[in-house]
Amino acid sequence: MKHLRVCVALMMATFVIWGCKEGNSSQQAGENDSLATANAGDSTIYGKCGEGSMMHTLELIDDEGKVHHFMINMDDSSVVQGGMLTGDRMAVIRSVVYGDTMATTVINLTTLQGKWSSLAKSFQIEEGGKVKSNADAESNPWTTWKIYNGKLVLNTDTFTINELRADSLFLENKEGIFGFQRLK
């Protein structure tokens, strides 16, 4: 009986020591992971539009391969920006209403990428968060982009996407509404 107690005590001590070592190593890896803090506070879910998407539902396959299903209120035409096409990269903001998961903002990132132009600015949104300016004389060209909590951030300028279609883009911030057309 005494031998059994000693064995159990040794096993418990081994598990405690092993558990502490694992906790320290994973904490150090998290501190060195630049992606872990890059979008801290961002509630956006990123992924690809799945084949199960329909007029009132969105199937999103996130970057880890998990499948999410969202209901879409089609009475509000501003919920989905850029359309939903199977395989397109999407950014989704969600909320839970009466137990159902609703997509409150859907941005088609594939549609957003490309060359855009207005009278004042001409730029190209590229994959990987890069923006290339097409006008040499711009005083403050945009060089980076990201979606953060359903808003488009170009350098330090934050915009609401009022409308995104295949040929047009309307952005709004505190300075006003800016319209762009797609260049081919």
What are these regions (language model features)?
Residues 1-20:
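Sec-dependent bacterial lipoprotein signal peptides
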Residues 20-184:
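Lipid interaction determinants
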